[in-house]
Structure formats: structure tokens, C-alpha cells
């Protein structure tokens, strides 16, 4: 049995500039971090001659790859030339799907990593992110960008640039104690609201020209966050995390409603900054606040479920049993 696990991510700034329609013209950039919540893939040969897939509450059993309903699994099998081999594939996740935390990118990377190991290959992180990006952006044309497969494959606290020269990430090197303080000032809440990102991203892509000014500002937010982190100005990082949210709300797409506006207002009144991660109204709420403000914010957000998270420095990993 081959196992692979790939971390989910929290975006801070620059998200949506990684979309192909923007990045191929102007270059995109994101700042984000991977967390200790994962997508897991198990893969093994079977003897019944079928492709067996188990994910969420779904069980697919098919004799040929074209009958696989799950787009990402089907295209990963096809790319890895495993379409003629009977295999069992199991998928598990620490958090719900469609949460705005890069789940599809993490899943694609995990699938590819497991399949490479199954074939006796040791892929590099760069290879994984390039193959996963190819499947999500080019093969499936899902309106998604390059960010999620890239940060989930690489891991860590990264600034990643996307342009004609390819995808290149660099670690934002800050002292461990500063990273610990930054992490301690982030609260994470689950709202239970799930939306698909594709409708919003499709609309943004079709109206990209009218959104360019805002997209350029979002791109600058990523560089400003990196600079603030390197300078140790964590409060400015928090402000910029919310600036990403406020700019995103100006774009065409389903990025804002009265619930989002009311939630951010509640958090701001208590001295915090907020962002709902993802290319949509995400299922999670990221809050930056000083330690002294956290209990007040927790009590005021008692209608939401707090989820404990830690930063993870590792990207995708695999093992064989």
C-alpha cells in the first residue's frame, strides 16, 4: 500500500492573481502557509480487475478509466499511465471539502505523489506542482489557478510567483520565535457555509479586464505582506490579510454577502482583522488579533466552531507499507 499526504493551506495575500488569465499577462504572486491539516491518499493493486475508488461517501467501481466520475482521479490516472491497471484508491481529509483551503490542489498533488511512488518513482516537489497545475488548469480548465497545487506541494511559509518563466517559490525567512508569535495571533473558525469556487472564478475570468486595477492591488498586497513579515510588523500583516479580503469583495464573483460584511464588522469592533479564505465565500474565517483580544473574539463568535491549527513546514510526503 502506498500512502501520500499533502497539507492544506491558508492564504494571506495575492490570491486570485495566480489565475492563468491574469498571471500569463502580468505575473501573479501569493503569500500563504501550509497547516497541519491534510488530504490523504492510499493506493494499492487489487485482484478483481476493476478501478475501485472510495472518497467521502462515494464508492466508484469501474472497468475503464473513461467511466471514472471524479475528474481529478481520472486525469491523474491518465497522466500517470495507470489507466489499464486495476487499483484501489482511498481518499480521506482532515477537513471538509469546498472549504477554501486548497483542497483540490492538495488532493491532486497527493494523488500524483502516490501514483509516482506506486511506479517506483521519487518525484520532486517542483515536478508535483507542475503536473498538478497542468491537470487542474490546462486539462480540466476548471478556472482554478496555480496557487493551491504549488503551495501544497512545496509546504511552508512561501511567497510564490507565477509567470512565463514558470512557478517559483521562496521561503519567507523569519525567526522561529516570530513565526510562533504570528501563529499564536491567528484564530480559525468554521462557519459551515460551503460554496463552489468555480462559478465565482468563471465570472472573474470572463470579466478580468474590468477587474485589472483591483487585481494589481491584490498582487501588491502579497509583496507588502512579505515585507511586513520580514520587518517583524505583525499588526501590519494582520491589516493586509484583511485588505486582501476587502479587495476580493470588489471583484466580480460570489465573494461577499451580508453575512460576510456583518462577520467582518463584528471582528473589527473587537480589534481583530478577518479574511474568508478561498476563491468564493469560504467555509472558514481567519482572524488576526493580539492575544489579549482573543477571548473576547471567541465569545463573540460562539456561533462558529473554532478549529486549532498549526503551521506546517513540510509539503507533500509519501510512504510505502
Predicted regions and their residues:
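Short, small-residue alpha-helix embedded
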Residues: 105-119, 281-288
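C-terminal nucleotide
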Residues: 1-13, 17-24, 32, 38-83, ...
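Residues at or immediately flanking beta-strands
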Residues: 86-88
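Active-site signature of cysteine proteases
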Residues: 29
Amino acid at each position: 500500500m502506498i500512502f501520500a499526504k499533502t497539507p492544506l493551506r491558508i492564504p494571506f495575500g495575492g490570491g486570485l492573481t495566480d489565475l492563468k488569465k491574469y498571471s500569463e499577462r502580468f505575473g501573479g504572486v501569493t503569500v500563504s502557509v501550509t497547516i497541519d491539516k491534510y488530504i490523504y491518499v492510499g493506493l494499492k493493486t487489487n485482484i478483481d480487475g476493476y478501478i475501485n475508488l472510495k472518497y467521502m461517501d462515494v464508492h466508484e467501481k469501474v472497468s475503464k478509466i473513461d467511466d471514472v466520475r471524479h475528474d481529478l482521479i481520472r486525469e491523474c490516472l491518465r497522466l500517470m499511465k495507470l489507466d489499464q491497471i486495476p487499483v484501489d484508491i482511498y481518499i480521506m481529509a482532515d477537513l471538509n471539502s469546498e472549504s477554501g483551503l486548497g483542497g483540490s490542489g492538495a488532493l491532486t498533488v497527493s494523488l500524483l505523489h502516490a501514483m509516482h511512488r506506486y511506479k517506483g518513482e521519487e518525484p520532486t516537489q517542483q515536478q508535483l506542482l507542475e503536473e498538478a497545475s497542468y491537470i487542474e488548469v490546462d486539462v480540466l480548465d476548471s478556472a482554478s489557478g496555480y496557487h493551491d497545487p504549488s503551495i501544497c506541494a512545496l509546504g511552508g511559509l512561501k511567497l510564490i510567483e507565477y509567470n512565463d518563466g514558470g512557478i517559483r517559490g521562496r521561503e519567507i525567512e523569519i525567526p522561529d520565535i516570530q513565526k510562533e508569535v504570528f501563529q499564536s495571533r491567528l484564530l480559525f473558525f468554521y462557519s459551515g457555509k460551503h460554496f463552489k469556487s468555480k462559478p465565482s472564478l468563471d465570472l472573474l475570468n470572463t470579466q478580468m479586464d474590468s477587474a485589472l486595477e483591483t487585481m494589481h492591488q491584490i498582487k501588491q498586497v502579497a509583496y507588502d505582506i512579505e515585507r511586513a513579515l520580514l520587518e517583524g510588523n505583525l499588526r501590519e500583516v494582520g491589516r493586509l490579510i484583511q485588505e486582501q479580503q476587502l479587495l476580493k469583495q470588489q471583484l466580480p464573483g460570489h465573494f461577499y454577502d451580508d453575512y460576510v460584511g456583518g462577520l467582518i464588522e463584528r471582528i473589527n469592533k473587537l480589534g481583530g482583522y478577518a479574511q474568508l479564505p478561498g476563491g468564493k465565500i469560504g467555509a472558514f474565517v481567519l482572524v488576526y488579533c493580539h492575544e489579549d483580544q482573543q477571548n473576547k473574539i471567541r465569545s463573540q463568535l460562539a456561533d462558529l466552531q473554532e478549529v486549532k491549527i498549526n503551521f506546517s513546514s513540510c509539503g507533500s510526503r509519501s510512504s510505502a507499507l
